[in-house]
Amino acid sequence: MNQFNKVCVIGLGYIGLPTAAIFASRKIKVIGVDINQNIVDIINKGKIHIVEPGLDILVHMVVNDGYLKATTLPEEADAFIIAVPTPFKGDNHEPNLDYIEMASKAIAKVLKKGNLVILESTSPVGTTEQMAKWLAEERSDLSFPHQCGEVSDIKIAHCPERVLPGQVIRELVENDRIIGGMTQKCAEYAIRLYKIFVQGECIMTNARTAEMTKLTENSFRDLNIAFANELSILCDKLDINVWELIKLANRHPRVNILQPGCGVGGHCIAVDPWFIVYQNPNEAKIIKTAREVNDNKPNFVVQKIKKKIKDILGPKIACLGLAFKPDIDDLRESPALDIVIKLASENASQILVVEPNIKQLPLKLQNKRNIKLVCLSQALDEADVVAVLVRHKEFIEVQSDKVVSFC
């Protein structure tokens, strides 16, 4: 029954589009769904709207070969993969599951007995079960795992992605995959689907554990980054070179301190720990503290830069990089973007932004009169102070006495 000839992927962003393209490259018919008509049109021309090495070639091939088609509405398929955003509601870090609910209701209309539905979106514990309830509300003619267990008409699983931006194509194929079924049979169905392209091990568990696994992975990484960032703040106060300190401490055979930076960004590490904290505010104390340390690091960077320009009349500040990590165009939760916004609020300063992976400033910056997107050479020539916020490959060789060390 679970022969996967056609897969429908909901959400064609940084995870959904690569996933759709890889399935299509294995000669599976793929329907990619996105509510943004512009994205749909771009993909159907065999082009891409994001920066990810190798993805442009892959999408061009599978679209031309007829295995990938983009549309704004779901179609009947054997398996459905939901890969939509899970942002926050307001300032209290409440998870916003609206996109998952909308995606669930959209695919419910075309579900048929024997289908598999997979939630890939990183989600708070219990979201997969909630998704099953949303589907059941829309389709009373079908049975779901929370109602009928192993004999349900529809199989449901949570299978979180765990890939590195810039290495997505390779890691989707090579990385181990956590497969969290609402029942064992649900997990078995999902493993068969992912084994179409996954060369790593597919490890079976339940949906709630799979949800918590992804949140735990990113919380662990956040904690380690917070330790490095807190060290950089302490060393600044104590007049110690943090880079030398970490290098020496790491000579201990059981110590591996990470490198500090200007904060933590992206839609994983900067977001996922808050899902744990929101559901468990009294227990997740260390996780919360780490988030606060990393969220506050941009303020520390801003103060360092302001100290450097305090005696300059009408200073020009070059900010190199806006993305949340090197060599990508993803600005979600970027600490570099936060730093630029804070600096721009000091109206006496002009900000020269260099971001080689975008063609125009994001909307948050477009209404700021004292911010310009410029090339690297112009920024280095005109700026009084240079802050390398993101170590894009274009910036690695930058050497200037104007560069501010903020760690």
Swiss-Prot record:
Coiled coil: none annotated. Disulfide bonds: none annotated. Its EC number is 1.1.1.336. It catalyses: UDP-N-acetyl-alpha-D-mannosamine + 2 NAD(+) + H2O = UDP-N-acetyl-alpha-D-mannosaminouronate + 2 NADH + 3 H(+). Gene3D superfamilies: Cytochrome c1, transmembrane anchor, C-terminal, NAD(P)-binding Rossmann-like Domain. One of its GO terms (molecular function) is NAD binding. Keywords: Capsule biogenesis/degradation, NAD, Oxidoreductase. The keyword Acetylation does not apply. The keyword Oxidoreductase applies. SUPFAM superfamilies: 6-phosphogluconate dehydrogenase C-terminal domain-like, NAD(P)-binding Rossmann-fold domains, UDP-glucose/GDP-mannose dehydrogenase C-terminal domain. Belongs to the UDP-glucose/GDP-mannose dehydrogenase family. Dehydrogenase involved in the biosynthesis of capsular polysaccharides. Catalyzes the NAD(+)-dependent oxidation of UDP-N-acetyl-D-mannosamine (UDP-ManNAc) to UDP-N-acetyl-D-mannosaminuronic acid (UDP-ManNAcA). This is UDP-N-acetyl-D-mannosamine dehydrogenase.
